[in-house]
């Protein structure tokens, strides 16, 4: 069986649809074979991307080295439907097309968080720090959050856990609406900017996520940037709001962020990126769902596992530094089987 590769001109066409990582935050450490796997492309096609202007450096041994986030954006914007980021988004958003009740019903998950140590997928499980190896720390589930119940695993007494973990967790969603006009105003400001393409929804490097106002001013945002910005604006309006971060659960776990706001004593979730993606639909390779987009303003979903963070901080660290995006390849979840 052969794997169809993306057409070279299609990959090249993605280059003017996103903004590459600023030089001061870019990490040029992804080689051509890794890039080719992520893009389902031949090495020669990756070389053409470099020739066409995709930023890179040339290592005397490894050859051209790219920024992984730039590659993810090439994959997301090429429109082939075959690349790793396209397939991942399509799979993880598939539940938006499911019946409304399925978004909220209690759902039991078996979760494994064992971050990949390399872009090729070497897992952190069982690895100990020392002897020159990376020290891996991960954020644990927030068991105090509404709708989160630990069934097996733990204890998770500290916010950070050495190496990885496994757990069984029940997530229960909740359908909520929002009435406060201040919330609606801040929400519209963020979502409308994405919908009007004044700000491009794309992968953003972690150092730029930490400087979310700069990212927004540059005209780029992902879930972390949008959620932090939304939380800032809600707090400025006098509301209690926090940017949350955790995992969107599916065959593999995806790092995701959203905003939590308190209205009438009830914690309500605001997910501007989910709302945007569900609105544009086929443009991003997922089902268009106005009903799901509307539910993103207030409702809590049973596929989002919040972790213990103060303001959507990174979920995985290598040697005390935020891990690259490819570390998420070692995070997985599946529905728990009944005993």
Spans of features found by a protein language model:
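Residues that mark the N-terminal boundary/hinge immediately upstream of a DNA-recognition element
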Residues: 31-32, 67
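Short alpha-helical "recognition helix" segments of helix-turn-helix
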Residues: 34-37
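Major-groove DNA-recognition helix of helix-turn-helix-type DNA-binding domains
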Residues: 41-61
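Short helix-start
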Residues: 56-79
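Secondary-structure boundary elements
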Residues: 136-221, 229, 294-337
